Amino acid sequence: MKDLYFATGNKEKMQIAQSVCEPQGLKVISIDLDIDEIQGEDPEIIVRDKAMRAFEKVKEPVVVSDDTWDIVALKGFPGAYMKSINYWFSSDDFLRLMHGIEDRRIILHQYLAYTDGNVTEVFRNDIPGKIIHKARGRNDKSPNMTVIEIDSDNGKTIAEIFEQDKDKITERYKKRRDVWHEFVDWYKNNSN
């Protein structure tokens, strides 16, 4: 089994990565790094830079992830600024922001970047959803997860999904094509 370093301290992200990669012969090793992220509006540039900064610290091939949200009615807000907005905004703030807006579509963009110092590849998956009218579920790390439903999750908020049996989360990701599946397909065809 090949080792793959994943720069994350997020247990849920790690579980998802392992559930997709390990059946394909990739052992995912979590490394919790403090990486300063550049600011900007292009998430691909940000995740590429993040991967290179992680590689400089680890000196091994590494994967990083980043997620962004685009609220359609707000012309893509918060986009690449999602991490900061999640820190500043509560779920009630998101609901107030969307008050009176009919188009409540949101697109969650998952990004992965892999680099070995020479080759850097970025993978992206878009997941449609919507911002609901009242918070449901609980998520202390990201309260806004209580106001977002993913189209494929039968009307449940992200928080409600994560409140359920967490083992089922990894099963869902094994079945649903996402950014990790795309990465594994590429990696198997392009690594030594």
Region roles according to the model:
Residues 2-5, 12-192:
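Anionic-ligand binding patches
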